Amino acid sequence: MSPEDPQETQPLLRPPEARTPRGRRVFLASFAAALGPLSFGFALGYSSPAIPSLRRTAPPALRLGDNAASWFGAVVTLGAAAGGILGGWLLDRAGRKLSLLLCTVPFVTGFAVITAARDVWMLLGGRLLTGLACGVASLVAPVYISEIAYPAVRGLLGSCVQLMVVTGILLAYVAGWVLEWRWLAVLGCVPPTLMLLLMCYMPETPRFLLTQHQYQEAMAALRFLWGSEEGWEEPPVGAEHQGFQLALLRRPGIYKPLIIGISLMVFQQLSGVNAIMFYANSIFEEAKFKDSSLASVTVGIIQVLFTAVAALIMDRAGRRLLLALSGVIMVFSMSAFGTYFKLTQSLPSNSSHVGLVPIAAEPVDVQVGLAWLAVGSMCLFIAGFAVGWGPIPWLLMSEIFPLHVKGVATGICVLTNWFMAFLVTKEFSSVMEMLRPYGAFWLTAAFCALSVLFTLTVVPETKGRTLEQVTAHFEGR
């Protein structure tokens, strides 16, 4: 065994085959960390009720025009892309716990700036700050949870990251019914504040502590999280933290998971989910549902329910099966949604949203049928996304990278995800103008089909494996 080999010197924390940890505090620690994803879910969902509220106001009150509204929805993803870079840097230097604590600062500050906004630039600045926090939380929370969880529950706890994201989105939708945009921003300060309080009492991950040569602290963390360190294999004495070097990209244990991680994030965003969630109210308004806010809340409830189902079956069904099933469902649902717009393309429209067609011009029986096609395909897409392509890319990102490159590698993946989210969100309307709405949704269906092929041919199964066994798989050991 060579002490210079980072693969051989990283800590091995895994229980023996005959014993499974039963500590319950790991669930409390995971909940505390998952309040970060809850916060960034709220930040994502905030734009949906806030934009209509800000566009309804009359001068001299603060009001958003069309271009400013587009940036208000999209700028959070730019901040999140920068947050992905910052989070990758913090992850290996400040540690997992401190990184989560630090990300509460831009969350609270950003929502406070929005609350006090007197002009559009303050609104955009506040959104940029919350986006920065979103990027850090979306990277650090999955890593923290995957490193404190034992294999038997890692899929369940890791899926709770996405569950908290969609819960945050739903919370923003529901609160948007009764709260004006300023008070809605005040509510956005609550989850990160609660995370700050809870995380102060949670331990650093044992794996990170071992890279810092803090053996006693690592064992204390194990006892706190799992109830006892008894039965666990003693990690190698020479375990130490190794920095990222470009030469490491020649190793299959590095470049293979990096390609997979980046591809997962690209396919997740090309499914069109963020465009749909950012413009949920507008899309349902164009479909002529009487209460578009109610339709958006319905979508949020479906997303929460099916993400919860995915979390419960993740460690039984496995990652690959759920990804493939999710992709197939999204192909059919987006194809159907595109068909809805194709059937209505020749009708006159008074819409201001890229020529989307009101179904009210049709006879009543046709109108009802088309309305059900629209809402049915949208809900089917959300359900399909929630059981696979919603939670699993984040879960796999936290599982497939070796400890010594996790900060840089996950940072690259998160940067990719949020940059793609910005492009899709900002340019979705332009694509709909260029290809027509039906063409835009059929294009997303094609990307979903490619994601199924990618899953079946490239993505490995990590169910039931320790993080070290996953690394060994990529190394061919």
From Swiss-Prot:
Tell me which tissues or organs this protein is expressed in: Highest level of expression in placenta and testis. Highly expressed in adult and pubertal testis, but not prepubertal testis. Lower levels of expression in brain, liver, heart, kidney, fat and skeletal muscle.
**A GO term from the CC aspect:** cytoplasmic vesicle membrane
Which PROSITE patterns does the UniProt record give?
MFS, SUGAR_TRANSPORT_1, SUGAR_TRANSPORT_2
Q: Where does D-glucose bind?
A: 162, 268-269, 274, 394
Keyword set includes Membrane:
yes
Q: Which family does it belong to?
A: Belongs to the major facilitator superfamily. Sugar transporter (TC 2.A.1.1) family. Glucose transporter subfamily.
One MF term in the entry's GO annotations: fructose transmembrane transporter activity
Source organism per entry reads Mus musculus
Q: What is this protein called?
A: Solute carrier family 2, facilitated glucose transporter member 8
Q: What induces it?
A: Inhibited under glucose deprivation.
Record's function text: Insulin-regulated facilitative hexose transporter that mediates the transport of glucose and fructose. Facilitates hepatic influx of dietary trehalose, which in turn inhibits glucose and fructose influx triggering a starvation signal and hepatic autophagy through activation of AMPK and ULK1. Also able to mediate the transport of dehydroascorbate.
Which range is the signal sequence, renumbered to this chain? none
Chain ranges on the Cytoplasmic side, renumbered to this chain:
1-25, 92-96, 149-156, 204-257, 315-320, 389-404, 460-477
Checking NCBIfam families in the record gives:
SP (TIGR00879)
Give a single Pfam family match. Answer: Sugar_tr
> According to the UniProt entry, where does the motif Dileucine internalization motif sit in this chain?
12-13
